[in-house]
Amino acid sequence: MKFTELTVKEFENFVQNPSLESHYFQVKENIATRESDGFQVVLLGVKDDDNRVIAASLFSKIPTMGSYVYYSNRGPVMDYSDLGLVDFYLKELDKYLHQHQCLYVKLDPYWLYQVYDKDINPLTEKNDALVNLFKSHGYDHHGFTTQYDSSSQVRWMGVLDLEGKTPASLRKEFDSQRKRNINKAINYGVKVRFLSKDEFGLFLDLYRETEARTGFASKTDDYFYNFIEHYGDKVLVPLAYIDLNEYIQHLQESLNDKENRRDDMMAKENKTDKQLKKIAELDKQIDHDKKELLQASELRQTDGEILNLASGVYFANAYEVNYFSGGSSEKYNQYMGPYAMHWHMINYCFDNGYDRYNFYGLSGDFTENSEDYGVYRFKRGFNVRIEELIGDFYKPINKVKYWLFNTLDRIRNKLKK
């Protein structure tokens, strides 16, 4: 085996292997996003004796104190069950970094520590051997965190395993609320379409509304546009919306049908108890449809023919479709836009051969008092599998300068207080 810099083509060919647990940050398109942020990029990997790539990682070189912080965001990509390969990679990476002006290195691999069912019952053993291997190479582990941290990627995820399933069989595994709300969205006639680059502002409108409502930390417009500009068809932006013209027409046709059926039944003499009950039920449905029709007509007058309900940013790579971020309109939540969007994207996975639908981030605190308990409950209702990643690892390379860097950082933080 040999540790080496890779060409873009070598890197891309390797990470396109769907059997590798790779992340959307470890794709060739991310080279351009990192460079547009002002960072140099280097592709490092391992080749076997037949010159085949067996490990790869995209590193950003972040200028710091006359040196570089080397950060492989969700890298490296490899068969991490092969501890011998991981050991070789870390050993050779250390040699490379000592020769290339590295201050310290950060790795947060897309590697599993433990897997749980939706109720946090363990399905696998803890992968302590992998964590201990990093530590044996001098890496500091950031810990098994159970909260969001703006300096780290999420460590917990909710994932749907689609392998061997169909949309119908998968839907049977959802809880009653998920099934009911998906059905509501379908009955309302909610549609989903993908936004073009020029329409991305529609996503941002819903995202900013949700940000203001929930108080969650958000990304800047430029952050999103950087991906939109460079990721091409690897970034997907669905929009769930309702066309009130179509909905009102459907409601009116349904109302007319029910009124006609009720009139026919009322015209009959000597009605049975069963017929009277049916008439009473139709009266309730007619009353409901009239209220819905009035509300929809008023909304069309005040808010327009098209109501944008929910939108999201998704990344698709060889391994999975990943829900990165989203927003929705609270005013129109009765139309179940987020459910329509997720159901559409789950079906997109089936249609395009993906075995994983990743709802992505969770804090790891699954108690009712946690900051994202509502998010967990939402994802839990889809019968997700909870995946815990191994976390962040740091290693100082230039130890003297690293000590000085941390000392100055602590002083700056004290001065800010």
UniProtKB/Swiss-Prot annotation:
It comes from the Bacteria. Its EC number is 2.3.2.18. Keywords: Acyltransferase, Cell shape, Cell wall biogenesis/degradation, Cytoplasm, Peptidoglycan synthesis, Transferase. The keyword Cell wall biogenesis/degradation applies. GO terms for cellular component: cytoplasm. One of its GO terms (biological process) is peptidoglycan biosynthetic process. It catalyses: MurNAc-L-Ala-D-isoglutaminyl-L-Lys-(N(6)-tri-Gly)-D-Ala-D-Ala-diphospho-di-trans,octa-cis-undecaprenyl-GlcNAc + 2 glycyl-tRNA(Gly) = MurNAc-L-Ala-D-isoglutaminyl-L-Lys-(N(6)-penta-Gly)-D-Ala-D-Ala-diphospho-di-trans,octa-cis-undecaprenyl-GlcNAc + 2 tRNA(Gly) + 2 H(+). It is found in: Cytoplasm. GO terms for molecular function: aminoacyltransferase activity. Catalyzes the incorporation of amino acid(s) into the interchain peptide bridge of peptidoglycan, using aminoacyl-tRNA as amino acid donor. This is Aminoacyltransferase FemB. It comes from Staphylococcus epidermidis.
